[in-house]
From Swiss-Prot:
Gene3D superfamilies: 6.10.250.2410, Structural maintenance of chromosome 1. Chain E. InterPro entries: ScpA, ScpA-like_C. One of its GO terms (cellular component) is cytoplasm. It is found in: Cytoplasm. Participates in chromosomal partition during cell division. May act via the formation of a condensin-like complex containing Smc and ScpB that pull DNA away from mid-cell into both cell halves. Signal peptide: none annotated. The lineage of its organism: Bacteria, Bacillati, Bacillota, Clostridia, Eubacteriales. This is Segregation and condensation protein A. It comes from the Bacteria. Keywords: Cell cycle, Cell division, Chromosome partition, Cytoplasm. Component of a cohesin-like complex composed of ScpA, ScpB and the Smc homodimer, in which ScpA and ScpB bind to the head domain of Smc. The presence of the three proteins is required for the association of the complex with DNA. One of its GO terms (biological process) is DNA replication. The keyword Cytoplasm applies. The keyword Methyltransferase does not apply.
Length: 254
């Protein structure tokens, strides 16, 4: 396993070069690499006390930077210019490697973000879906084209009637109020009357979702104060409500 050592928050020389390019607001695709040579060498000076094996990669890049800068400062004669054209440009090679490193670093950052986001996502476990045999039935038996047309028009008319083009409320909406205390008293009386009372039975008697929610909260409160207990044989099975006896309440601890 390869050991990656961070030196003052930089993972290798290319990471340092990218930092200097960003710090000096330079374009990586159009840069004179010698512009950041001085700053790079200042950083190398601060690594004198570090292990040579750790700083060797930094020193290799530093020598390349000095080579590039020295070639720019020294005068060129015609023979050297022709030789330079035929040889590979060290500055171009370094920039190509730096651009490639930047691409991999961006991809690594993206994958890290996806990994961290994945810890907050929970997927549903796969189920075994039984294949149902398709019944070969002709649903259009004794149905005429005219009857289909009339049915289509009826559906379109109902759909248009539901659309509120004026963006106004045609009638006042009355707020249905349900109190938890009232539902608690109602549940206690129902449990006394019916010893085998299920929550689904209570829910069916509710007129809306809001009443179901208030009824459920009332049930939780009755359980908390040890007046009612619920019995369920297994997950997703029916929930039955029973009155709690005094001796049972003394044995429970919350």
């Amino acid at each position: 396993m390869e050991l990656q050592i961070k030196i003052q928050n930089f993972q290798g020389p290319f990471d340092l070069l990218l930092h200097l390019i960003k710090k000096n607001q330079l374009d990586i695709y159009n840069i004179n690499i010698s512009e950041i040579t001085g700053q790079y060498m200042e950083y190398i000076e601060s690594l004198k006390e570090m292990d040579l094996e750790v700083t060797s990669e930094f020193i290799v890049i530093a020598s390349t930077l000095l080579q590039i800068k020295s070639r720019e400062l020294l005068p060129k004669i015609q023979d050297e210019e022709e030789e330079e054209i035929s040889e590979e440009n060290p500055e171009k090679i370094l920039l190509d490697k730096l651009i490639e490193y930047k691409k991999f670093k961006n991809v690594a950052s993206y994958l890290k973000g996806r990994l961290e986001k994945g810890f907050t996502v929970f997927s549903k476990k796969p189920e075994i879906i039984e294949k149902k045999e398709e019944e070969d039935k002709d649903i259009f038996i004794d149905v005429t084209i005219l009857e289909l047309y009339n049915l289509y028009n009826e559906l379109i008319t109902k759909y248009k009637d539901k659309i509120n083009l004026s963006n106004t409320i045609p009638e006042e909406i009355e707020l249905e109020e349900f109190k938890i205390g009232d539902k608690m008293n109602y549940l206690k009386s129902r449990i006394i009357e019916n010893k085998n009372l299920s929550f689904s039975q209570i829910s069916k008697e509710c007129s809306c979702k809001g009443e179901v929610i208030v009824t459920f909260l009332a049930l939780l409160e009755l359980i908390r104060i040890k007046i009612v207990k619920v019995v369920q044989e297994g997950n997703f099975k029916e929930i039955y409500l029973e009155r709690m006896e005094e001796n049972e309440a003394d044995e429970l601890y919350y």
